[in-house]
Design a protein with these regions (language model features):
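Gly/Ala-rich phosphate-binding loop of Rossmann-like dinucleotide-binding domains
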Residues: 48, 52, 189
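Helical element adjacent to the flavin cofactor pocket in flavoenzyme catalytic cores
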Residues: 169-226
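Beta1/beta-strand and adjacent pyrophosphate-binding region of the FAD-binding site
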Residues: 29-43, 61
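N-terminal mitochondrial targeting presequence
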Residues: 1-31
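Glycine-rich FAD pyrophosphate-binding loop
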Residues: 52-75
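Short loop/edge segments at beta-strand edges and connector loops
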Residues: 64, 117, 152-153, 199-201, ...
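Dinucleotide-binding Rossmann-like beta1-alpha1 core, especially the glycine-rich loop
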Residues: 79-159, 165
């Protein structure tokens, strides 16, 4: 077997060993880190971006197994900007959904990301579904979903002529966006703030090392010592 060429990136309290042919992106000249995020989807880049923007003294890195951001779930979903109707009232998820709704539109507008506030209809197609629809409407009200209302069949046709139903919830602030594009903007923000990205780094395992004093993060050809 041909030996793997190794380079070492020194980090605060740990070292990153990586193949020399791996792509490394950074505006930051230092190679010392305080925090490393694993995973380059929207959650990973949002987390890394928030960490470095709120803690400018930290040196933050991110590793991703693919050669670009949002290859998997973040780039393959329905693309909905949710307005907070479905989640259990009082939960963190419900609260964050409403807050995220406004922040998403603000971020997309600021960064010229294509998006559309198209609205959404949740339709009861027959009388037997009305109770469930009413319950969902009450949940949306309790969550603070903005401007939702119950409408009848005629109003449904006004909004969407090809939709048939006896009653519906109209959520005018629900929208659509390509979350893969949002993720790429988060990645650019992260790098512009001094973050560092290593692509083609697939983490395979985490192992305790030397009596709980360090952690080995292992990929197919790389070892990260924490």
């Amino acid at each position: 077997m041909k030996p793997v060429q190794i380079t070492t990136i020194k980090m605060k309290n740990f070292k990153l060993f990586s193949n020399s042919n791996k792509r490394l992106y950074s505006k930051c000249k230092t190679n010392s880190y305080d925090v490393l995020v694993v995973g380059g989807g929207i959650v990973g880049f949002a987390t890394a971006r928030a960490l470095i923007s709120r803690n400018k003294h930290l040196h933050v890195g991110l590793v991703e197994k693919e050669n670009r951001p949002s290859v998997h779930q973040s780039g393959h979903n329905s693309g909905v900007i949710h307005a907070g109707i479905y989640y259990k009232p009082g939960t963190m998820r419900a609260k964050m959904c409403i807050e995220g709704l406004y922040k998403t539109y603000e971020y997309c507008a600021k960064n010229n990301i294509p998006h559309k506030k198209c609205g959404k209809l949740i339709v009861a197609t027959n009388e037997s579904q009305i109770k469930s629809l009413n319950d969902l409407y009450e949940r949306g009200l309790e969550n603070g979903t903005p401007d939702i209302k119950l409408i009848n069949g005629n109003d449904i046709k006004t909004i969407e002529p090809y939709c048939n139903g006896v009653r519906a919830i109209h959520s005018p602030h629900t929208g659509i966006v390509d979350w893969a594009v949002v993720t790429k903007h988060y990645a650019a923000d992260f790098v512009n703030l001094g973050g560092q990205i290593t692509y083609n780094f697939k983490v395979k395992s985490f192992e305790e090392y030397k009596h709980n004093r360090a952690l080995r993060i292992i990929s197919e050809k790389n070892v990260l010592l924490l």
